[in-house]
């Protein structure tokens, strides 16, 4: 689900935290990708001309495999090395959010069924997309495909976003990539959004600097996590009626959720704290997530198993042999070259002197000269 209103809040208070660029600008980078999130995107966006998901002759959905295969190749062609991180078991606190998602899908199914032969094609597609979920089988299919492609995968013990952030903090990759803004709660040096979007959508990649975001918001990591819980996260409900502006104001004024709760319970406001609100437990999940240590993880990109890809994707899933072979050759070529060094890793950026700086230096020099003459 992410954190409601966080993106807008950071843009308002920390505009310097954002960079926008194209895929090619990530040349030479290693990136940890939230696999479940990108599979969900592919199931929604990779469609036939009639809006239906891609399927093979047996009626099996293949949108997720097509998306993973071609987008990964595009990254490798741009000298980017991706690693896909898969979710493990969800935290107990997330059970409520998962139940809500199930209820929303059931409601969408009822609304879709109610349309029957009525309504527009767009109406039917709208409800169909709300029904999308990534199944365990689709996760396993994606893992098998990535292994055949020679792309490393990591199975997180719990949340994939937390594991992506751990890999970035540990220096194994440059950034964590996910659409979920709550990834920032796990302190990745950089968060990439829209990385797995198709280039045809013409949506630039967003890079958010954690350090710059905290500087602009003027918060430490504990306060930032409390802000995200107050805005609304996957682990617990929030205080009804508190939006982004109010949430930010409350954290700045009181400093922590404990003090906000204390202030509310003294009757100083119209807000009501949810009964048995587990905000402290939610905070702990963000500050001390269950992850594999980056130092214990070895990431290796290997040469693709071309014949294995043909067997799995062509014979097993009904893809075009010519396209799979062509894609495999691009992958082979890209991975063989390795990640080339970036120019910014060899040079230190030096601030340029503008006209004013030169003028100031000249004035200072003249003043010093005059003093010496005296």
UniProtKB/Swiss-Prot annotation:
Alphabetical keyword list: DNA damage, DNA repair, DNA replication, Endonuclease, Exonuclease, Hydrolase, Magnesium, Metal-binding, Mitochondrion, Nuclease, Nucleus, Phosphoprotein
Binding site residues for Mg(2+) 1: 34, 87, 159, 161
A GO molecular-function descriptor: 5'-3' exonuclease activity
Classification via Pfam families: XPG_I, XPG_N
Region (Interaction with PCNA): 339-347
Cofactor: Mg(2+)
Region (I-domain): 123-254
One GO CC term, this protein: nucleoplasm
Principal location: nucleus
Residues where DNA binds: 47, 71, 159, 232, 234
Any single biological process term in GO: base-excision repair
InterPro entries cross-referenced by the UniProt entry: 5-3_exonuclease_C_sf, Flap_endonuc, HhH2, PIN-like_dom_sf, XPG-I_dom, XPG/Rad2, XPG_CS, XPG_DNA_repair_N
Its EC number(s): 3.1.-.-
PROSITE patterns: XPG_1
Binding site for Mg(2+) 2: 180, 182, 234
PTM summary: Phosphorylated. Phosphorylation upon DNA damage induces relocalization to the nuclear plasma.
Gene3D superfamilies: 5' to 3' exonuclease, C-terminal subdomain (1.10.150.20), 5'-nuclease (3.40.50.1010)
Region (Disordered): 353-374
Region of interest: N-domain: 1-105
Location in the cell: Nucleus, Nucleolus; Nucleus, Nucleoplasm; Mitochondrion
Cofactor note text: Binds 2 magnesium ions per subunit. They probably participate in the reaction catalyzed by the enzyme. May bind an additional third magnesium ion after substrate binding.
Membership in a protein family: Belongs to the XPG/RAD2 endonuclease family. FEN1 subfamily.
Function according to Swiss-Prot or TrEMBL: Structure-specific nuclease with 5'-flap endonuclease and 5'-3' exonuclease activities involved in DNA replication and repair. During DNA replication, cleaves the 5'-overhanging flap structure that is generated by displacement synthesis when DNA polymerase encounters the 5'-end of a downstream Okazaki fragment. It enters the flap from the 5'-end and then tracks to cleave the flap base, leaving a nick for ligation. Also involved in the long patch base excision repair (LP-BER) pathway, by cleaving within the apurinic/apyrimidinic (AP) site-terminated flap.
Protein name as it appears in the record: Flap endonuclease 1
Organism: Candida tropicalis (strain ATCC MYA-3404 / T1)
Organismal lineage: Eukaryota, Fungi, Dikarya, Ascomycota, Saccharomycotina
